[in-house]
UniProtKB/Swiss-Prot annotation:
The lineage of its organism: Eukaryota, Metazoa, Ecdysozoa, Arthropoda, Hexapoda. This is Pre-mRNA-splicing regulator female-lethal(2)D. GO terms for cellular component: nucleus; RNA N6-methyladenosine methyltransferase complex. GO terms for biological process: cell differentiation; compound eye development; female germ-line sex determination; mRNA modification; mRNA processing; primary sex determination, soma; regulation of alternative mRNA splicing, via spliceosome; RNA splicing, via transesterification reactions. Residues 254-319 form a coiled coil. Belongs to the fl(2)d family. Component of the WMM complex, a N6-methyltransferase complex composed of a catalytic subcomplex, named MAC, and of an associated subcomplex, named MACOM. The MAC subcomplex is composed of Ime4/Mettl3 and Mettl14. The MACOM subcomplex is composed of fl(2)d, Flacc/Xio, Hakai, vir, and, in some cases of nito. Interacts with vir and msk. Part of a complex containing fl(2)d, Sxl and vir. It comes from the Eukaryota. It comes from Drosophila melanogaster. The keyword Nucleus applies.
Length: 536
């Protein structure tokens, strides 16, 4: 694009760039351009043809060959010098032109950058203007909405004011309102009272208008004061009497309520104590039931083991007496397991014949049977092992041991049941009472604190001359004397009276009475009686 083809708008950035260019550089460019134009106009490029002046001088001044040669050399030197100057000028002109072109290109690039920046700024400003216009529209719309709401509120306020304005009908309904009527009635009463007080005050003022020397007026005023004081005292007395009566009634009601509360609290404590006692009794009953169950299970197991042990001992005892003096001895033993409530059965056996005489022996199968025969160590060891296995308890009572002795009685052989003393189940102590400061304890519990109570349980065994069966503990206690006199055997034990017992068992002689006494003590404990002395 040439400078002439550029419009004024396009030339303005160039003019601005020329204005911005430093003056020294601008002057240098102008000098270079002027020098290049002058050199081109005057000399131009060196030509081989001589000029007119040179030709005239060459023709009109003939000189010798040497002089002509020097002139040619000088001309050549001048030409070379001019050529060098021209070349230098051309180079300077080319450099100036290149600089001018570079400056123009730089200005053009700057102008293009400025144009791009201006376009971007124009786009940005247009966008900002659009945003501003959009915001203006939004704000105008909001303003219109607010104005509409404001007008609506104004109209609503006007309607409310118009509605609240009292009309004639509203006033009439207000007069018919019970609350307004009550208010008017009170105002009327207050007005009447005020008028009455005003009249009384006026009358008093008129009565006070007497002379200071009049005695009648003075007496009347003193009497009025006295009556007024008496009236006040009477009112106080009546009010005080009523208040005193009400206070006494209130005090009586308070005392009655306190008594009721106290009795209720006592009843609550008593009921709580009863609940605790019932819980304790229930726990005791449960514990006793568990103990009874375990005791029954143990009794059954011991009965089974006892039956096995009796069979083994009977076989061992009867086996050595197989033959005596050519005779035979056969014994048939019938073992039966009898429960506590059942009777003992009579088991007939074959008699033992010794030289034609009948011999019946009382055999008591007990956990431990000490035999006088030294050759039966095996039997004694077996009995001791059985006793050690079956009777490992916390505290074992002395066992009654019966030694077989011959008696000239019937031909039947029976076995007596052994005595097994089972410790009575423990009972839980009662809980403390809240009404009483001391612990409530029964006589049976006090007795338990002093000495333990053991309840014997009879285990059936085979004994000679068995007594009649016992239906209950009371029947056994009642028939004890008859059994002692008829058969000579102590009930509940199967021990014959007068039979010698080994001296190594110190508790055997006192066993029957002690067992019966303990049975009675258990029954007395259940009935709540006093303690029993076990020393008898």
């Amino acid at each position: 694009m040439s400078v002439a083809a550029m419009t004024m708008d396009d030339q303005r950035p160039c003019m601005n760039s020329y204005d911005k260019m430093p003056p020294t550089k601008y002057e240098q460019n102008l000098n270079i351009l002027n020098s290049s134009q002058n050199s081109g106009a005057t000399g131009g490029p060196a030509s081989p043809t001589p000029s007119g002046l040179e030709d005239h001088h060459h023709h009109h001044h003939p000189h010798p060959h040497h002089h002509h040669h020097q002139e040619q050399q000088q001309q050549q030197q001048q030409q070379q010098h001019l050529q060098q100057q021209q070349q230098q000028q051309q180079q300077q002109h080319a450099a100036a032109v290149a600089e001018a072109v570079a400056a123009a290109e730089q200005r053009q690039r700057l102008l293009e950058d400025e144009i791009e920046n201006l376009k971007l700024e124009q786009v940005r400003m247009a966008q900002q203007c659009a945003d501003a216009q959009r915001r203006e529209k939004i704000l105008m719309r909001r303003l219109a909405n607010k104005e509409q709401e404001f007008q609506d509120y104004v109209s609503q306020i006007a309607e409310y004011k118009a509605q609240q304005a009292p009309t004639a009908l509203a006033l009439r309904t207000a007069l018919l309102d019970p609350a307004v009527n009550l208010l008017f009635e009170r105002l009327k009463k207050e007005l009447k009272a005020t008028k009455a007080k005003l009249e009384e005050t006026q009358n008093e003022l008129s009565a006070w208008k007497f002379t200071p020397d009049s005695n009648t007026g003075k007496r009347l005023m003193a009497k009025c004061r006295l009556l007024y004081q008496e009236n006040e005292e009477l009112g106080k007395m009546t009010s005080n009497g009523r208040l005193a009566k009400l206070e006494t009634e209130l005090a009586m009601q308070k005392s009655f309520s306190e008594e009721v509360k106290k009795s209720q609290s006592e009843l609550d404590d008593f009921l709580q104590e009863l609940d605790e006692d019932v819980e304790g009794m229930q726990s005791t009953i449960l514990f006793l039931q568990q103990e009874l169950k375990t005791t029954r299970d143990r009794i059954q197991t011991l009965e089974k083991e006892n039956a096995q042990l009796k069979q083994a001992i009977k076989d061992e005892v009867v086996a050595p007496a197989a033959a005596t003096n050519g005779g035979t001895n056969t014994t048939i033993n019938k073992l039966e397991t009898i429960h506590e409530d059942a009777c003992m059965a009579n088991n007939p056996t074959n008699p033992d014949c010794y030289n034609g005489n009948t011999n019946n022996e009382q055999i008591a199968a007990v956990p431990q049977i000490p035999l006088s025969d030294d050759g039966s160590n095996m039997n004694g060891n077996a009995a001791r092992l059985a006793r050690k296995r079956n009777y490992q308890e916390e505290e074992a009572l002395p066992t009654v041991v019966v030694v077989p002795t011959p008696t000239p009685v019937g031909n039947n052989v029976q076995e007596a049941p052994p005595i097994r003393e089972v410790t009575a189940p423990r009972t839980l102590p009662p809980k403390k009472s809240k009404l009483r400061g001391i612990t409530t304890r029964r006589n049976s519990q006090l007795e338990e604190d002093h000495q333990p109570v053991t309840t014997p349980v009879a285990v059936p065994m085979i004994v000679d001359n068995a007594v009649a069966g016992m239906a209950s503990e009371e029947a056994a206690a009642a028939a004890a004397a008859v059994n002692n006199s008829n058969t000579g055997i102590i009930p509940e034990t199967g021990v014959q009276v007068g039979v010698p017992v080994e001296g190594g068992d110190p508790g055997a002689p006192a066993a029957p009475g002690r067992i019966l006494t303990r049975r009675r003590s258990v029954r007395m404990q259940q009935n709540g009686s006093g303690a029993v002395d076990y020393s008898t």
